[in-house]
Amino acid sequence: MDKIAIISDVHANITALNAVLDDIYSRGISRIFCLGDSVTKCCNPDLVIDKLRENCEVVLRGNCDESISSPNAKLKSFWSRVKIGEERANYLHNLPVMAEFYMSGRLVRLFHASPFSTSHIYNPMYSNQNTLREVIELGSPMQLFENTEFLGKTPNDPIPDVIGYGHIHTPNVFRYKNKTIFNTGSVGMPIEMANDNNLQNADNRFSTLASYIILEGIYDSKELSTFSINLVRVPFDIEKEIEYLENSDMPGKDKIIKSLRTASSN
């Protein structure tokens, strides 16, 4: 059986990324895909980009990667852009928005946020409490499976069986109309306490952990066989990452420090 580690939303947190990579390699996994948002939030975007380039077979583009590579980047993004330099900014700008492959007879499609852009929001954790937001932002979960021009697809292309995405920083796996959808959560900026109403005032020890997904099956096989999706949580030294932030001149770092400690939105 083959294993693929799917990570996302590292957000310049080199401490969390190192912890997750150590966990991945300790499991004998060598194939790693990243679904975007490598930068912003934390203060080591240059180190994170270089580490991802060294270790990931696939890196996709997220909305923060787009914002940092824009000449009109806002203050916090501009700070990160200056730190990464032009070559890394060009690298982010040219990243693909989608990856797909067959695994154990299932077509798996990966993107950062949705088939429509790198910034649409679909969060099933809101489905019961806030259907209006779901409808406004994206609508039915089946829209995640659409073949869109943004992805470089045509209506005649095969429809995926499994969708994997990041962006919302809330890990989950669920089935819908015989399809499978998973979210990796975030390596570098877990904010699960903010995204799930059931966790309000709950113990945040587990919500502050980095998360990623392991797919297990036969890679590049169209023949139906055993397939599994596993969600992994990894502790990392939050205070070490906070020390990096405190010693930096990055704007807005106080909100990021609070988020790292509480898993709440900044």
Predicted regions and their residues:
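Beta-strand-turn-beta hairpins that frame and shape the catalytic cleft
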Residues: 1-5, 100-109, 176-180, 223-227
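Core catalytic region of metal-dependent phosphoesterases/phosphodiesterases
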Residues: 2-93
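Active-site environment of divalent metal-dependent phosphoester hydrolases
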Residues: 11-15, 40-43, 64-70, 116-118, ...
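His/acidic metal-ligating clusters that form di-metal
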Residues: 27-28, 87-174
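Structural motif
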Residues: 58, 108, 161-162, 179-181
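Acidic, His/Gly-rich catalytic cores of divalent-metal-dependent hydrolytic chemistry
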Residues: 174-266
